[in-house]
């Protein structure tokens, strides 16, 4: 197997293992009652906002999958859809991304309470989203968990190539989002589809961002989220 590909797969596997450990050690909770008063929405607040974490090694922004997803979603809803690119190195630092995503969701919930939020991510960015939505306590570098009631501001969740699939759907660990989460794995993508390591190299192209776009899965996710924003 190609050395670079091997390192990437092992790194993604390690990240998935760490995430799995966090999820399995975290008690399942269902959020309730957002504390305190919230500010009224302003004209600067969009109807909806996608809060997206890009995949590993992608340049700053929301990445190939994120851009395609936002573009497709905007074409399907007659609403002002904003976008926030989660700020993190997109290497191995899931906790950095999770802290930033959580902080932004909390900020929007307070400053734009009527804005419907759509957190999501691709590959490592999906792992970032997993931590934010499924881990209600501080652990392993994640220091800014969502307060109870935050789920009231989240309309839908869109995840692509999510490594947590090795231990089960993320909705097993965050049941509050069960009916508003779409989690997609392309074919035999080795990151989200448990498989024999001997097949990883052959199946690696199925994890690439372009595969999720060209297969129609990004459009499928946009259809799902559009339905939740109606």
UniProtKB/Swiss-Prot annotation:
Active site positions, chain numbering: 123 (nucleophile), 189, 207 (proton donor/acceptor)
One Gene Ontology cellular component: extracellular region
Compartment annotation: Secreted; Cell surface
EC numbers on record: 3.1.1.-
Keyword Hydrolase: yes
Disulfide bonds: 45-112, 185-192
Uses, biotech or industry: Five Rv2301 high activity binding peptides (HABPs) could be included as components of an antituberculosis vaccine.
Root EC class: hydrolase
Biological process according to GO: lipid catabolic process; symbiont-mediated evasion of host immune response
GO-annotated molecular function: carboxylesterase activity; lipase activity
Protein purpose: Shows weak esterase activity with the p-nitrophenol-linked aliphatic ester pNP-butyrate. Does not exhibit cutinase activity.
Entry similarity comment: Belongs to the cutinase family.
Protein name: Probable carboxylesterase Culp2
């Amino acid at each position: 197997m190609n050395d670079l590909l091997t390192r990437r797969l092992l790194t993604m596997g390690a990240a998935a293992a760490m995430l799995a450990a966090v999820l399995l050690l975290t008690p399942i909770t269902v959020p309730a009652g957002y504390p305190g008063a919230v500010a009224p929405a302003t004209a600067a607040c969009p109807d909806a906002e996608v809060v997206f974490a890009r995949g590993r090694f992608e340049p700053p922004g929301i990445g190939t999958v994120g851009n395609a997803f936002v573009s497709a979603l905007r074409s399907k809803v007659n609403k002002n859809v904003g976008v926030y690119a989660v700020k993190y190195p997109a290497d191995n630092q899931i906790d950095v991304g999770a802290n930033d995503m959580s902080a932004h969701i909390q900020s929007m919930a307070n400053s734009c309470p009527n804005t419907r939020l759509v957190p999501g991510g691709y590959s490592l960015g999906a792992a970032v989203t997993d931590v934010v939505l499924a881990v209600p306590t501080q652990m392993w570098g994640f220091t800014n968990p969502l307060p109870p009631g935050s789920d009231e501001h989240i309309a839908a969740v869109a995840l692509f190539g999510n490594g947590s699939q090795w231990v089960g759907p993320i909705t097993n660990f965050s049941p509050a989002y069960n009916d508003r989460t779409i989690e997609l794995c392309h074919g035999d993508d080795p990151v989200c589809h448990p498989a024999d390591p001997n097949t990883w190299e052959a199946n690696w192209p199925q994890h690439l961002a372009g595969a999720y776009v060209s297969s129609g899965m990004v459009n499928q996710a946009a259809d799902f989220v559009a339905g939740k924003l109606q």
